[in-house]
UniProtKB/Swiss-Prot annotation:
InterPro entries: SAM-dependent_MTases_sf (IPR029063), UbiE/COQ5_MeTrFase (IPR004033), UbiE/COQ5_MeTrFase_CS (IPR023576). Methyltransferase required for the conversion of demethylmenaquinol (DMKH2) to menaquinol (MKH2) and the conversion of 2-polyprenyl-6-methoxy-1,4-benzoquinol (DDMQH2) to 2-polyprenyl-3-methyl-6-methoxy-1,4-benzoquinol (DMQH2). Its EC number is 2.1.1.163, 2.1.1.201. GO terms for biological process: aerobic respiration; menaquinone biosynthetic process; methylation. This is Ubiquinone/menaquinone biosynthesis C-methyltransferase UbiE. Keywords: Menaquinone biosynthesis, Methyltransferase, S-adenosyl-L-methionine, Transferase, Ubiquinone biosynthesis. Gene3D superfamilies: Vaccinia Virus protein VP39. It catalyses: a 2-demethylmenaquinol + S-adenosyl-L-methionine = a menaquinol + S-adenosyl-L-homocysteine + H(+); a 2-methoxy-6-(all-trans-polyprenyl)benzene-1,4-diol + S-adenosyl-L-methionine = a 5-methoxy-2-methyl-3-(all-trans-polyprenyl)benzene-1,4-diol + S-adenosyl-L-homocysteine + H(+). GO terms for molecular function: 2-methoxy-6-polyprenyl-1,4-benzoquinol methyltransferase activity; demethylmenaquinone methyltransferase activity. The lineage of its organism: Bacteria, Pseudomonadati, Pseudomonadota, Alphaproteobacteria, Hyphomicrobiales.
């Protein structure tokens, strides 16, 4: 489970994959990972999910069911390349406005380029900022989405509290994340794929296995479905549920600010 701890010298430590690092160092280490993979992020997700992330994301947007009306505002966090935001805007009939927030400028650069090619720039705003300290007024958004990003945040509880703060009353939180496989045979297959194949595929694609090794380890350190649902409730959300995808390889968590 990814959480902050107090070290022997009184400082806060958190997990970076299977390593324990000072809390203040994790974000910089994660940034290095995503600077390396930004240009090939979709390929990375294909490798990590065995190609299933596209269907999971489509299911996430179907669950959100964005309103087809002007003024509907969504904050997509850790969404630099725009993959989720583009889907939201299209699903709303190009009525919604999505703010794409990411701490990594390289990822945002890829997203902005793609938005121009898709002629969606008018529906999108790209913001470089930290999920733990959102630069928005309270009650600014109708929905908050984050896909495969929350496990990379050093202080997950802080990010969830910020999500609650910036949502309007009646707003919805949706978190799509790799999770704990709940099928006995599938868990062994996915473990073998994750620790043996994924880093090697990553090295073949990008020339560097290390970012993929971290990403695999970060999945194993992330809270399981029930524990993460409890964290969402602790942040103040109501009607908290989750839906497993592909035997729990990923899970979609939902909560409401009521």
């Amino acid at each position: 489970m990814s959480e902050s701890r107090t070290s022997a010298d009184g400082g806060m430590e958190t997990s970076y994959g299977f390593r324990e690092v000072p809390g203040g160092e994790k974000q910089g280490l994660v940034n290095q990972v995503f600077h390396k993979v930004a240009k090939r992020y979709d390929i990375m997700n294909d490798v990590m999910s065995m190609g299933m992330h596209r269907a999971w994301k489509d299911a996430m947007i179907a669950a959100l069911n964005p309103r087809k009306e002007p003024g509907y505002k969504v904050l997509d966090v850790a969404g630099g390349t725009g993959d989720i935001a583009f889907r939201i805007v299209e699903a709303s009939g190009r009525q919604a406005h999505a703010t794409v927030l990411d701490i990594n400028g390289s990822m945002l650069g890829v997203g902005a380029e793609r938005a121009e090619k898709k002629k969606l720039s008018g529906n999108l705003t790209f913001v470089e900022a930290n999920a733990e300290e959102l630069p928005f007024e309270a009650a600014s958004f109708d929905a908050y989405t984050i896909a495969f990003g929350i496990r990379n945040v050093p202080r997950i509880d802080k990010a969830l509290s910020e999500a609650y703060r910036v949502l309007k009353r009646g707003g919805r939180l949706l978190v799509l994340e790799f999770s704990e496989v709940d099928m006995p045979l599938l868990d062994k297959i996915y473990d073998a794929w994750s620790f043996n194949a994924i880093p090697q595929f990553g090295k073949a694609i990008t020339g560097d296995a290390e970012p993929y090794q971290y990403l695999v380890e970060s999945i194993r350190k992330f809270p399981n479905q029930e524990n993460f649902a409890a964290m969402i409730r602790q942040a103040g959300f109501s009607r908290v549920t989750y839906t497993n995808y592909t035997g729990g390889i990923a899970a979609l968590h939902s909560g409401w600010k009521l």
